[in-house]
Amino acid sequence: MEKPSAPHLPEDNRLPLKVNESEHIAESGESTVWKMGIQDSLGNEQHIALKQNRREAFASDEEMQKSKEFYEFLKSFPGFGKFVPETLYFKARVAEGDTPQAFAIQSLLEGRTLDEIPDEELYRDPEVVKQLIEFAHAAIDILQQTRRAGTLKPDFGVAGTASEEAQRQGNTFGNSRFTTNVLVSDAPDEHGQRVFFIDTGVNADERVNKTRQVVERQVMGRLREFNFNRWIKKLEARLK
């Protein structure tokens, strides 16, 4: 059977970007992630990650504001914000006549997500291990805070494009060691950061389903917290 072709952006797209090249790199639910080379206002090429949310309801002014507010919550949360890359939100039509959709832009980070990195490679660099410990502590704090407040939490799950084992570990057993939403960059940024939480949006199903929100906070959130604590002990043992 012939493998279906990957999605592609039309050359005459209506995005407010001067796109030199684009490559489809991930798919999860109603979201698509593109790797792009774009030309800025000075004529310089920049490489970005563009996340497209195809659910029309999320492109309303109200929902766009909620997306920005959730990003600002993550960015300003003590201990967690340092892991969140700068993100720009906007809405646009992909092609003439299309319904507007919601988009988010981040500078492209070269690296791999946790589900793609085996233990021995992930734990090889002590600085990465230290940052993972910091991240896990911050993730526990934000899970506890959102549970107390009854508000939306970050998505520490695994996308459907990951391996079956990563999905089983991350989505069934709540083990965020395998999340597709944390990336370890190949090289540190100007602040020495290598660990990044790259999905600054709310899980789409949680966003529209109040019952799912409660279950995720009270059940899966607690399970993720338990697994984060176990992971911290494992990471700390690597530094001894």
Model-derived features with residue positions:
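Juxta-kinase regulatory segment immediately upstream of eukaryotic protein kinase catalytic domains
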Residues: M1-E23
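Short, solvent-exposed loop/turn segments that connect beta-strands within catalytic domains
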Residues: Q39-Q46, F80, V94-P100, D186-R194
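A conserved alpha-helical element in kinase catalytic cores
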Residues: N53-A92, E127, T211, R217, ...
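Conserved kinase catalytic-core helix
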Residues: R112-V195
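Activation of the activation-loop gatekeeper triad in protein kinase-fold domains
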Residues: I198-A204
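Catalytic-core segments of enzymes that bind and process phosphorylated/nucleotide-bearing substrates
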Residues: E206-R238
